[in-house]
């Protein structure tokens, strides 16, 4: 017995010695890994130089009416006094962005060379008449303003821990090479790279717990592009909980103790910078605020855009089309429906259905005006606002209890999704408001990868109708699918796998992959039909059908991503620890 005990003690001692000897090796291994990570140069400037050639080649390519929009804004801010900027309406492309963007346009107009001025760049006319000099100048302003995006994301990489730097490099490079920025900015024509750089700066500041800087950059972003207001509930709750409220040290004994719940100095600093930035932005227009607000929030434009954004209202509009067709072809379906749903919630008879079709814009004419549904109830702006706020409240509640960066980015993504899916007159380009914050989130856990793949692939493909000319089909399709292949694989390699949870959260991931792979044949068939439709009169009757397929199919992917992320965000506590 004594011999057995002594042998056991010797074995335990030997194990302890081996463990003790292994500890320095582990430390050295960790140090070596970090040294290896630190010795690598995670620079984005190689990407800027390499993509510069592609962007320069795209200068003479197709551009949308947004090009003349921004040309007109250059002219307005350059030629007119500031008091007339938001009143000028010679062109239909009136100034409808916040004042900081107007100041930005004024700044750019100061660098317009004489040859570009002579080309008509700064003429205030109903329809712009310009040539290659104006095109080159405006394209270059987009390219060089986008440098800010590279700078902000390089700061994000450099401020990340060495052990996580490869992951942050994947995140940053996927954003600067985003198909969305290539399609929207460098072909279609806008300044989203520059504008999202400011928003991303606020996200990076939040990650580094620089809360005042976060507030400054987010408020500035709103003053450049008011669509960022959709994210305000998330920023408000995050800054309130992380910077203003002193919850950790709070002990309730009497109601006076609530005074100590608030860090008053922090609240004062936060309020000062936010109010100060809004004052700088809007003070020159204080006497014309109703006019400015009417330009920024034009509710008369209708529920959906001419091309339905791939959201809930696209499915709602599609269902209205299906019901209308079915009831006209099979009148007894209408008779059956009226037994359960009474007018005015449904047309009284087939004659009324035909009258509504003849009289109203039912969403399939490509008109930018108020849309009237034939069968389904009309949707007022108030309802879209209520739905958006409801789902945003659900997104920010967990953030109120856990103001971590991971929760913040998750809440930010869901707030963007809620506004995109249920908002009023949402543009397809607003999907970038979802994809960009989701990119920062996906690296935390591999279970987030499939929802991200869904929203990224469906979101980027939904932008294809912006470039409707056949000459752009190859570039937009090839670039998007190469990006998807590279970065979906890169995220799979660099994202963490939670060892605490082995079950498959997103159990429909194979169905999701089937959906993603189906996008390519769908867009190819639609492009072929678009190219040959002029030969066949029956295809010309269904001119809007291709856009409808884009909207409906892409909305299915984006809504599925929303369901999956919402489930993980609200019910998988281990993922957020």
UniProtKB/Swiss-Prot annotation:
- Family per similarity comment: Belongs to the ALG6/ALG8 glucosyltransferase family.
Q: Name one GO biological process term.
A: protein N-linked glycosylation
Membrane-spanning parts: 43-63, 93-113, 140-160, 169-189, 220-240, 267-287, 308-328, 383-403, 420-440, 448-468, 471-491, 505-525, 544-564
- Organism listed in the record: Saccharomyces cerevisiae (strain ATCC 204508 / S288c) (Baker's yeast)
InterPro entries xref list: Glyco_trans_ALG6/ALG8
Q: Where in the cell is it found?
A: Endoplasmic reticulum membrane
The entry's keywords: Endoplasmic reticulum, Glycosyltransferase, Membrane, Transferase, Transmembrane, Transmembrane helix
- Give the record's pathway: Protein modification; protein glycosylation
**Annotated Gene Ontology cellular component terms:** endoplasmic reticulum; endoplasmic reticulum membrane
Indicate what this protein is called per its UniProt record: Dolichyl pyrophosphate Glc1Man9GlcNAc2 alpha-1,3-glucosyltransferase
Name the source's superkingdom: Eukaryota
State the residue spans of region: Disordered. 1-24
Cytoplasmic-facing ranges: 64-92, 161-168, 241-266, 329-382, 441-447, 492-504, 565-577
Residue intervals annotated with topology Lumenal: 1-42, 114-139, 190-219, 288-307, 404-419, 469-470, 526-543
Task: Supply one GO molecular-function term.
Answer: dolichyl pyrophosphate Glc1Man9GlcNAc2 alpha-1,3-glucosyltransferase activity
Q: Does the keyword Phosphoprotein apply?
A: no
């Amino acid at each position: 017995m004594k011999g057995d005990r002594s042998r056991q003690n010797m074995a335990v001692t030997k194990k302890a010695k081996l463990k003790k000897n292994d500890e320095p090796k582990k430390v050295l291994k960790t140090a070596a890994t970090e040294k290896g990570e630190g010795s690598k140069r995670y620079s984005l400037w190689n990407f800027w130089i390499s993509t510069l050639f592609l962007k320069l080649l795209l200068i003479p390519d197709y551009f949308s009416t947004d090009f003349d929009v921004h040309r007109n804004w250059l002219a307005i801010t350059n030629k007119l006094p500031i008091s007339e900027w938001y009143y000028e309406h010679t062109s239909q492309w009136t100034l409808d962005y916040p004042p900081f963007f107007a100041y930005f346009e004024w700044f750019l107009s100061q660098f317009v060379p004489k040859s570009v001025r002579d080309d008509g760049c700064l003429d205030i006319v109903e329809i712009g008449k310009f040539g290659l000099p104006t095109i080159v100048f405006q394209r270059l302003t987009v390219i060089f303003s986008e440098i800010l995006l590279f700078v902000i994301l390089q700061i994000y990489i450099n401020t990340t821990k060495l052990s996580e730097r490869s992951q942050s490099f994947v995140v940053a490079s996927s954003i600067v090479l985003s198909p969305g920025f290539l399609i929207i900015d460098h072909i279609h024509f806008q300044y989203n790279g520059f504008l999202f750089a400011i928003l991303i700066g606020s996200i990076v500041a939040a990650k580094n717990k620089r809360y005042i800087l976060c507030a400054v950059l987010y408020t500035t972003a709103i003053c450049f592009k008011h669509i960022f207001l959709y994210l305000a509930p998330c920023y408000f709750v995050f800054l309130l909980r992380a910077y203003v409220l002193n919850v950790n040290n709070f002990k309730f004994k009497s109601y006076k103790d609530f005074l100590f719940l608030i860090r008053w100095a922090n609240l004062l600093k936060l309020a000062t910078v936010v109010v100060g930035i809004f004052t700088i932005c809007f003070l020159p227009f204080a006497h014309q605020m109703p006019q400015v607000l009417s330009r920024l929030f034009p509710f008369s434009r209708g529920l959906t855009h001419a091309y339905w954004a791939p959201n809930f209202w696209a499915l709602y509009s599609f269902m209205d089309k299906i019901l209308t067709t079915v009831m006209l072809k099979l009148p007894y379906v209408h008779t059956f429906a009226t037994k359960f749903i009474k007018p005015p919630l449904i047309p009284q008879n087939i004659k009324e259905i035909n009258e509504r079709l003849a009289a109203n814009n039912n969403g399939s004419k490509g008109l930018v005006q108020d849309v009237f549904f034939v069968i389904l109830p009309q949707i007022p702006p108030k309802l879209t606002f209520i739905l958006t706020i409801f789902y945003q409240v659900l997104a920010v509640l967990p953030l109120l209890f856990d103001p971590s960066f991971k929760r913040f980015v998750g809440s930010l993504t869901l707030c963007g999704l809620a506004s995109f899916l249920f908002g009023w007159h949402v543009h397809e380009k607003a999907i970038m408001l979802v994809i960009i914050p989701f990119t920062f989130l996906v690296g935390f856990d591999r279970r987030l990868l499939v929802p991200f793949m869904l929203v990224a692939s469906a979101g980027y493909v939904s932008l294809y109708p912006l470039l409707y000319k056949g000459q752009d089909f190859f570039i937009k399709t090839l670039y998007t699918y190469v990006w998807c292949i590279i970065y979906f694989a890169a995220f799979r390699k660099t994202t963490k796998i939670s060892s605490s949870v082995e079950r498959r959260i997103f159990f429909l991931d194979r169905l999701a992959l089937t959906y993603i792979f189906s996008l390519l044949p769908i867009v190819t068939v639609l492009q072929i039909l678009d190219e040959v439709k002029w030969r066949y009169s029956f295809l010309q009757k269904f001119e809007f059908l291709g856009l409808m397929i884009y909207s409906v199919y892409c909305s299915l992917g984006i809504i599925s991503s929303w369901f999956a992320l919402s489930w993980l965000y609200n019910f998988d506590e281990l993922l957020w620890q």
